Amino acid sequence: EFKTKEKIKKYLDEIGISYTEYKNTTAIVAQINGDFEKTVGLRADIDALPIDEELDLDYKSKNPGVMHACGHDAHTAILLGACKVLYENRDLLKVNVKFFFQPGEEIGAGKYMIEEGCLENPKVDMIFGLHVGSHIKTRYIEIKNCSRFY
């Protein structure tokens, strides 16, 4: 997660979006504030799992013993893309937007982000999380109404 965090920070710096780091976690929360009443959050997991990647493909993990399984690298890339597009079009927004790059999804580390106040200043009214899945057809999305922040 430490190398992933550094890559996220570098990209956010390149596009010019502000972000907050948290002392007890590798979490990053970027935000676009426009003094709006409502704030929407977008969330993706950034953690690697302690698994050796056995397939010898171009995109294989370069770090032995860890890999971004379950699509975590895709989740991070998608959220970074959302940061870029929404920041470039911030004049069209009618809400503040917070982007949650959450570490330790598999072990419930979202709890530490919440304890450190990531849902405040401005208060977040709703969060949309994302997860890629092989059970979802290409060009489709699946929406569930539930409360989760692992």
Q: What kind of region is each of these model predictions?
A:
Residues 29, 49, 57-67, 74, ...:
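Histidine/acidic-residue-rich, glycine-tolerant segments that coordinate divalent metal ions
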Residues 81:
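Active-site signature of alpha/beta-hydrolase-fold catalytic machinery across serine-
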Residues 1-68, 77, 85-93:
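Acidic/His- and Gly-rich active-site-bordering loop/insert found
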